[in-house]
């Protein structure tokens, strides 16, 4: 490819031969009007192209309005360029492309070279891993050898560990049972104290005869006793008060609700004044303070 241009003077015609000196074609991309004398009037200039017997109008130029014009014209055979200007030349320009065998071989060689360069660029862009130069990073911790025999597990040590675990479980079970018994005793004493506190104002009302209806005062007390205590028969002995556990007293441990509660193994305690029986000393003391003024 090379630059091409031609000047068509006033009153002349220029013949264009794309095949001279070698096979090629001409691409006309622009045409412009040359300088003219000032005293000459502004006249329109018509551009012509003659191919064989056919004459084609390419466009019209004017010095003040359209001094140049863009074209997209390809000439591959003999042609003639002309114009109608009487005061200025017209310039045609573009480029010439060779189409001969030599040019084709040049283009093929250049394309092959471009392909080789592209392939080399792809190879260079990829990192090559060499087996000889590659180094494996060593781990910070030592790796045990494959051939080294593994140590046999000691059966005696395993048996000792199992026995220790069983003993820990037994101790934990005893602690839970002890804590549940303590919670049962506390709940018994609290329920008895609540019952005594409710009975005391009821009796005072009866003594002062402030309320004639005695059944109305005693009704809520018996209802509460029916809910909180359940009598149990034990071999001809007196009925024993069995308390319902209160799990909300201690947040850390919850008593076993399914486990039945038994009376105190030390025996029953009875009040000397009213002959009421209690399962522990704390309940008896609270009863004396509430019913008999601490006697």
From Swiss-Prot:
GO CC annotation terms, alphabetical: nucleolus
Composition skew (Basic and acidic residues), residue ranges: 123-135, 200-213
Recorded coiled-coil stretches: none
This protein's UniProt keywords: Chromatin regulator, Hydrolase, Metal-binding, Nucleus, Phosphoprotein, Repressor, Transcription, Transcription regulation, Zinc, Zinc-finger
GO biological process, alphabetically ordered: chromatin organization
Residue stretches of biased makeup (Polar residues): 254-271
Keyword Metal-binding: yes
Classification via Pfam families: NPL
Region Disordered, annotated ranges: 105-271
Compositionally biased spans, kind Acidic residues: 109-118, 159-199
Compartments in which it is found: Nucleus, Nucleolus
Zn-finger region bounds: C2H2-type: 269-292
GO terms for MF: hydrolase activity; zinc ion binding
Gene3D superfamilies for the chain: Nucleoplasmin core domain
Listed InterPro entries: NPL, Znf_C2H2_type
Family as reported in the entry's similarity comment: Belongs to the histone deacetylase HD2 family.
Function field: Mediates the deacetylation of lysine residues on the N-terminal part of the core histones (H2A, H2B, H3 and H4). Histone deacetylation gives a tag for epigenetic repression and plays an important role in transcriptional regulation, cell cycle progression and developmental events.
Name of the molecule in the record: Histone deacetylase HDT1
Gene name of the encoded protein: HDT1
């Amino acid at each position: 490819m090379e630059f091409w241009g031609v000047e068509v003077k006033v009153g002349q015609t220029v013949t264009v031969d794309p095949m001279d000196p070698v096979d090629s074609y001409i691409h006309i991309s622009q045409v412009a009007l040359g300088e003219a004398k000032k005293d000459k009037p502004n006249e329109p200039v018509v551009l012509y192209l003659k191919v064989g017997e056919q004459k084609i109008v390419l466009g019209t130029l004017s010095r003040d309005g359209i001094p140049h014009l863009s074209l997209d014209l390809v000439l591959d055979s003999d042609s003639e360029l002309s114009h109608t200007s009487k005061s200025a030349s017209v310039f045609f320009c573009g480029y010439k492309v060779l189409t001969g065998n030599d040019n084709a071989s040049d283009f093929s060689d250049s394309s092959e070279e471009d392909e080789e360069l592209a392939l080399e660029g792809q190879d260079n862009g990829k990192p090559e891993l060499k087996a000889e130069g590659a180094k494996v990073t060593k781990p910070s911790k030592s790796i045990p050898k494959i051939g080294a025999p593994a140590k046999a597990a000691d059966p005696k040590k395993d048996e000792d560990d199992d026995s220790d675990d069983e003993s820990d479980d037994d101790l934990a079970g005893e602690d839970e049972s002890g804590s549940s018994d303590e919670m049962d005793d506390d709940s018994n004493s609290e329920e008895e104290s609540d019952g005594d506190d409710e009975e005391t104002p009821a009796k005072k009302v009866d003594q002062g005869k402030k309320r004639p209806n005695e059944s109305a005062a005693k009704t809520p007390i018996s209802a509460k006793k029916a809910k909180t205590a359940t009598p149990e028969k034990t071999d001809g002995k007196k009925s024993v008060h069995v308390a319902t556990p209160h799990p909300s007293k201690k947040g850390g441990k919850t008593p076993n609700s399914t486990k039945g509660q038994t009376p105190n193994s030390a025996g029953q305690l009875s009040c000397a004044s009213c002959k009421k029986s209690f399962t522990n000393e704390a309940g008896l003391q609270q009863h004396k303070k509430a019913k008999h003024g601490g006697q």
